[in-house]
């Protein structure tokens, strides 16, 4: 009888212990649910998430901002600000110098939205990102795609204008003129095309050096450098090559054939370097003068584009040097 009572008491105490442990846990769980329901700060809302991403963007914490914009799009895909969030993702990458990632983000937007304010801006930013990557051909393709898809004359004219300046950047003057001429008459004053055409015509008088002539002149050591207006290099080349030639001649004249052969071998290397250096100097001279011309042209005539697609306008900014 005693043994039976023992078997009955043991399960009873086990049940009591387990029940007493479960009650606080269940109350804690229920309390946490009620706390989250009663505390609005713990609830993810579209406004809070978007504003948080905006604050990060304003603080120039671009990479974190991009992630928070992505989180906003993931949780609230039907929110009317999704397109803006996508654009800001692209801008976050662009402003942080990650141009290839920016291109991917902007392209994603242009595939999802058509002829909206931010899709058109995205086309422009894609071309600018490619320019920063020195991928000028890709920048031209992007803007030509915009020309094809848009039905807005103002947008098309701005694309033509941007294309023209890319061609100026790579010194393709005739192509630049061709695209500037495509701009409609109503926007010709907006982009100051008459003044631009007059300044662009000055490319014909950019100082140039002929690389072939520089090489031929270098038959006389230093003459090629002198032609390219590198006077110090011309003097050094003349003295060095002249000295080696004279030393080799003296060695052979005194029957020091080994020394003469060595000096001839060394001298030939310097002589070839004199020719190559002169040709390279001509190319550098031309690039430098072209860059100076492009810089002055941009400073004096380029319109500072600030897209205002709602009002169909641009902010015009000119700088003149005298």
What are the roles of these predicted feature ranges?
Residues 84, 98, 118-121, 128, ...:
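Hydrophobic alpha-helical membrane segments
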């Amino acid at each position: 009888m005693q043994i039976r009572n023992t078997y009955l008491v043991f399960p009873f105490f086990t049940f009591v212990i387990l029940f007493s442990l479960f009650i606080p846990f269940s109350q804690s769980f229920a309390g946490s649910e009620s706390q989250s329901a009663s505390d609005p700060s713990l609830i993810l809302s579209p406004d809070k998430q978007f504003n948080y991403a905006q604050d990060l963007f304003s603080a120039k914490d671009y990479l974190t901002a991009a992630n928070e914009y992505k989180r906003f799009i993931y949780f609230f895909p039907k929110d009317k600000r999704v397109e803006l969030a996508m654009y800001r993702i692209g801008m976050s990458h662009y402003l942080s110098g990650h141009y290839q990632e920016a291109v991917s983000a902007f392209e994603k937007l242009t595939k999802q939205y058509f002829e909206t304010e931010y899709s058109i801006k995205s086309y422009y930013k894609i071309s600018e990102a490619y320019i920063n990557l020195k991928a000028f051909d890709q920048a031209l393709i992007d803007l030509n795609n915009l020309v094809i898809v848009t039905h807005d004359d103002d947008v098309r004219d701005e694309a033509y204008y941007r294309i023209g300046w890319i061609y100026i950047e790579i010194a393709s003057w005739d192509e630049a003129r061709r695209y500037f001429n495509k701009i409609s008459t109503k926007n010709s004053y907006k982009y100051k095309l008459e003044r631009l055409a007059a300044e662009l015509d000055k490319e014909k008088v950019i100082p140039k050096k002929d690389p072939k002539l520089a090489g031929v002149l270098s038959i006389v050591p230093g003459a090629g450098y002198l032609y390219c207006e590198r006077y110090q290099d011309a003097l050094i080349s003349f003295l060095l090559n002249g000295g080696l030639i004279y030393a080799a001649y003296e060695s052979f004249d005194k029957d020091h054939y080994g020394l003469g052969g060595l000096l001839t071998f060394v001298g030939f290397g310097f002589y070839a370097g004199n020719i190559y250096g002169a040709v390279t100097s001509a190319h550098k001279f031309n690039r430098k003068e072209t860059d100076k011309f492009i810089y002055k042209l941009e400073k004096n005539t380029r319109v500072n584009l600030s897209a205002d697609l709602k009002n169909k306008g641009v902010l015009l900014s000119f700088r003149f040097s005298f």
